Amino acid sequence: MFINPRNVSNTFLQEPLRHSSNLTEMPVEAENVKSKTEYYNAWSEWERNAPPGNGEQREMAVSRLRDCLDRQAHELELNNLGLSSLPELPPHLESLVASCNSLTELPELPQSLKSLLVDNNNLKALSDLPPLLEYLGVSNNQLEKLPELQNSSFLKIIDVDNNSLKKLPDLPPSLEFIAAGNNQLEELPELQNLPFLTAIYADNNSLKKLPDLPLSLESIVAGNNILEELPELQNLPFLTTIYADNNLLKTLPDLPPSLEALNVRDNYLTDLPELPQSLTFLDVSENIFSGLSELPPNLYYLNASSNEIRSLCDLPPSLEELNVSNNKLIELPALPPRLERLIASFNHLAEVPELPQNLKQLHVEYNPLREFPDIPESVEDLRMNSERVVDPYEFAHETTDKLEDDVFE
């Protein structure tokens, strides 16, 4: 099982923000307002000037622009039309969605705009953002820098995943969520002064350290960087999720009591701090552990594979998935009754304890097993190879029998 950390806060990214009635409206100055005819003419000219052979659906785009203007609609959707550019936009617009096109730049954006979603384009730069903007979604572009954001006093959500950013500008105090994974970031701006920030996604960058984190934080995802240490975490009262896998960590700081998910896979850890009682998900695989201390009582997922573990502590009764493959285990403790998946391949096990009746997956290949437990009927995925056999004569006969079975199947 793998938990996608973005599911913790996926409500932020499901759709652009809608009209917010509690915000002060930004009036459009009268001298800048064009007539409907002027907009129609400008859009018709933009349609006629489409590059030949590009397959752009500018006729469809103009139809939607006219409809938006006629109805004074606050939202405009121009997804998947193959557009290489956008014309001037209706002045009353509050939400623009123009994802999955070939845009290399954006026109001047309406001052009333609150939500901008233009992911999966070819944007290399952004001009200044409208003052009322709340949502900025520009993932999967070619951005090398962002405009100044500190004065965007309504901005709540920034998604700049999968770009070429080497640095982020100072962030506004209103920010609640930032996704900046898969860039080239070497550092993050100051975060401690962001009182509403709940989630940071900065995985797959080149971060060497993290700044001090705000008290409001709930999720930090910083896997696949070059972090050698983590900042203080214990005093963050709402922190539930830490993903710091694939880094250079040798130690961890004390953990907050609110923590529910901890992924520190593929580091250089030899031990863990005291684990919070609230922890339900723990991945410490591919480290240098020789053992694990007491496990939290509500843990349902434990991956401790590819370490140097010789013995395990008692397992909590809540555990549903256990992966301890590629260790130095001689025996396993009693298995919890709710366990559904047991992966203990590549160890030194001579026997396996009694198996739970709900077990669905059992991998114990590459162990010198002398005895087999009764396999529950619930098991759907079973791997037990012939290395279990100690007697070479028995091994030879079983191998021959298996080959004959394979021939006649």
UniProtKB/Swiss-Prot annotation:
Residues where Ca(2+) 1 binds:
N246, D266, N326
Amino-acid positions noted as binding Ca(2+) 2 in the UniProt annotation, renumbered to this chain: D266, N307, E308
Q: Which PROSITE patterns match?
A: LRR
**Where is the protein situated, by its record's location annotation?**
Cell outer membrane; Secreted
Can you tell which superkingdom this protein's organism belongs to? Bacteria
Annotated Gene3D superfamilies: Ribonuclease Inhibitor
- Know the name of this protein? Outer membrane protein YopM
Q: What species is given as this protein's source?
A: Yersinia pestis
Gene that this polypeptide is encoded by:
yopM
